[in-house]
């Protein structure tokens, strides 16, 4: 008797559950038609990419031997005072913290202690004072640059910009090359 009551209750509960589930979830009708999506075919022919009149063979490579280049803007002539102020203003407009670094011997990446990148391969320079937190005027940064040039006239000096929110270096460029360096 007890087993028949139990089976009747289980059957009633299962029927109620199936009805509730059918009302809650829509039935699966299949995927949408493929014809509703636009399809474009890509052409893998490289000749269709060049739009300069077929002069692709005329491009030249910068000679890597005897012409050491460093970082951003190093392929340009030395920055004028006005250009330097504009670069520093760009750095400040983006909310980055300016900082000066100098390297008295090597202004470029080099390998001295092995063939893998490491601490002593020219990537890490000496910081000039502290980062200029709260700096709002490019002339403050240029004044620090002039002070660093007086203290280390034979050093390479670069200006970097840190994003203190993301904690990354966002910009870096050589602001001063020593007179003894022949580019």
Curated annotation (Swiss-Prot):
Write out the transmembrane intervals.
none
Q: Which UniProt keywords apply?
A: Calvin cycle, Carbon dioxide fixation, Chloroplast, Photorespiration, Photosynthesis, Plastid, Transit peptide
One GO CC term, this protein: chloroplast
GO BP term, example? photorespiration
What is the extent of the transit peptide? 1-57
CDD domains, alphabetized? RuBisCO_small
Q: Which Gene3D superfamilies match?
A: Ribulose bisphosphate carboxylase, small subunit (3.30.190.10)
Its induction, per UniProt?
A: Expressed at intermediate levels.
Where does the UniProt annotation locate this protein? Plastid, Chloroplast
Q: Which GO terms describe its molecular function?
A: ribulose-bisphosphate carboxylase activity
Listed InterPro entries: RuBisCO_ssu, RuBisCO_ssu_dom, RuBisCO_ssu_N, RuBisCO_ssu_sf
Classification via HAMAP family: RuBisCO_S_bact (MF_00859)
Q: What else is known?
A: The basic functional RuBisCO is composed of a large chain homodimer in a 'head-to-tail' conformation. In form I RuBisCO this homodimer is arranged in a barrel-like tetramer with the small subunits forming a tetrameric 'cap' on each end of the 'barrel'.
Tell me, what does this protein do in biology? RuBisCO catalyzes two reactions: the carboxylation of D-ribulose 1,5-bisphosphate, the primary event in carbon dioxide fixation, as well as the oxidative fragmentation of the pentose substrate. Both reactions occur simultaneously and in competition at the same active site. Although the small subunit is not catalytic it is essential for maximal activity.
Q: How does it assemble?
A: Heterohexadecamer of 8 large and 8 small subunits.
Entry's family note: Belongs to the RuBisCO small chain family.
Q: What's the protein here called? A: Ribulose bisphosphate carboxylase small subunit, chloroplastic 3
